[in-house]
Amino acid sequence: MKIEPENEYRDRRSLTNILGMAKRLLGVSIKENGVYADFTMGNGNDTLYIKKMCPSGTIYAFDIQPAALEATKKLLESEGCMDENVHLICDSHANFQKHIPENETLDGAIFNLGYLPGGDKSTTTKTSSTLTCLSGALDMLGPGGVAVVCVYPGHEEGAREGAAILELAEGFDRVGFDCLYHRLVNIPEAPFIVAFQKKIGKTPKFRKIGKISL
C-alpha cells in the first residue's frame, strides 16, 4: 500500500523527489535474472519499474487490497510487462514467506509505506507487520542485495513506523549491513528513506536497541 505524496515529492527535478531517489537506490541491486519483492504493491508503479529494469527477473508483489492487484495487473499488461515471472499476491507482506520459496534469495526489495493512493486512508501499513516483513526480507537478501523503505511520518502510524525502522537500522553492526538514512532536514513531516545493503562476504550482526531485536 502506498501513501499519496504531495506533488512536490513527485518532481523529478527536486530534492524532495523521494520516490525517484528510492528507485535509484533500488537500481543498485538490479541484475539479470534477479529476484525482487515489492512489499507494498499499491497501484503497481514500483513493480513496473523493477520489471522494466530487469525483464528477465522474478518479482513477488504484495498487497492486502484486491483493488491494488487489479490496478497493478492492468498497468503491467498495458506496458507489456505482465508474464509468468510476475507474482501478484493478495496477502499481508508479513506473510511473504508463505509465498516466496524458502530457498529463494532476494536481490532487492522495496517498501512504499502508507495507504493506497485513491483508496481508503484508514487502511494503512502497520508498524508490527512492516517490521516483521522487513526483518524477514533483510534475512533473505543475498550479498549486495538492497532493501529500500519509503516512510511517511506525516500521519500517526507513519511516524511510529519511521521511528521503529530507524531504530532497527541503527541496531545493525556495520560488519554485515550498510544502512542509509535520507531525508529533508528542515521539513520534519517530509517523507524519508531508510535503505539497507547486505555486504558481500560478511555475516550480518545486530546490536539490540530498545525493544527491537532480530
Question: What role is predicted for each listed range?
Answer:
Residues 155-214:
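Class I S-adenosyl-L-methionine
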Residues 140, 144-151:
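Conserved beta-strand signature within the Rossmann-like core of class I S-adenosyl-L-methionine
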Residues 65:
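Conserved SAM/SAH-binding beta-strand->alpha-helix loop
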Residues 39, 62:
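Conserved beta-strand/loop positions that form the S-adenosyl-L-methionine
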Residues 1-37, 45-52, 70-104:
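S-adenosyl-L-methionine
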Residues 52-58:
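Conserved S-adenosyl-L-methionine
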Residues 110-133:
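Mobile active-site "lid"/loop adjacent to the S-adenosyl-L-methionine
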